[in-house]
């Protein structure tokens, strides 16, 4: 049997819920958008913010952008490893679809580079047990244009306890002279396209012919397909996008040589 509600709460709540439903739906929608992640694992709301920040026509302050990114509770590692590469990839895709012109992409890449420098200044380095800080040379050969990716790798290597030097668009002879002078423990060559593999082959052969023992040589970049076949063709020790893999390979070889 139905009972009277002397306080009229049923009617009041029903009316109030009717007014609140659109607001609640909007809040839920916004929260869902904030939780949306890209295939890389990056949160969409952060990617959208950073893309706007580097693409805006107004001035860009990497310090202020870093503060904003930290407001999203991001670690320095996540900013370097995930968000800067993700936004760089998005800009490349937008250029291919004519949603962003070349000049804007260039400016955006330079801004990401300055943000990377700002983030790298706050990096904490790890100490590799049992060895002095390994020295790594990151090489972007002539004809390659993806300097930002190499800078990200350099930052990751520094975080892993390495001393790092960058070789940007140097001729093969300059690279060889640098290797002879610096004696790096590992060399990371960046290659974005198959047409650049021949340059990698020449550089690897030259380095191995003049340095004994040869440093660990790794190949990274936008490599797809038969990675083991690429490794054999180029003569590198490993093909990987992970700086951690290269350092791990070096450490294993270093320990094996020390025992021998």
Predicted features by range, described:
Residues 215-222:
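Short beta-strand elements of ligand-binding domains
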Residues 1-124:
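Long amphipathic alpha-helical segments
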Residues 121-208, 216:
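Conserved mid-sequence domains
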Residues 193-196, 222-226:
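Short Gly/Pro-enriched loop/turn and capping motifs at secondary-structure junctions
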Residues 85, 141-144, 223-224:
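Short glycine-enriched loops at secondary-structure junctions
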Residues 223, 227-260:
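Peripheral docking tails and interdomain loops at the edges
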């Amino acid at each position: 049997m139905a009972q009277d509600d002397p306080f009229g709460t049923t009617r009041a709540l029903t009316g109030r819920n009717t007014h609140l439903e659109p607001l609640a739906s909007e809040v839920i929608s916004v929260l869902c958008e904030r939780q949306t992640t890209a295939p890389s694992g990056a949160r969409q709301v952060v990617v959208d913010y950073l893309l706007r920040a580097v693409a805006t026509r107004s001035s860009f302050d990497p310090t202020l952008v870093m503060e904003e990114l930290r407001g999203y509770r991001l670690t320095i590692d996540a900013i370097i490893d995930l968000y800067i590469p993700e936004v760089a990839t998005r800009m490349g895709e937008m250029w291919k679809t004519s949603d962003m012109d070349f000049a804007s992409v260039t400016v955006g890449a330079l801004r990401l580079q300055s943000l990377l420098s700002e983030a790298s200044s706050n990096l904490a380095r790890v100490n590799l047990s049992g060895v002095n800080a390994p020295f790594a040379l990151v090489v972007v050969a002539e004809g390659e244009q993806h300097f930002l990716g190499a800078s990200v790798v350099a930052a990751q290597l520094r975080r892993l306890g390495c001393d790092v030097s960058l070789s940007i668009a140097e001729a093969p002879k300059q690279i060889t002279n640098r290797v002879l002078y610096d004696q790096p423990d590992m060399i990371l060559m960046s290659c974005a396209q198959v047409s650049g593999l021949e340059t990698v082959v020449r550089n690897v052969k030259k380095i191995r012919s003049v340095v004994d023992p040869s440093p660990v040589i790794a190949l990274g970049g936008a490599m797809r397909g038969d990675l083991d076949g690429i490794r054999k063709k180029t003569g590198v020790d490993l093909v990987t996008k992970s700086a951690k893999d290269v350092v791990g390979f070096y450490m294993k070889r270093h320990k094996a040589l020390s025992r021998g």
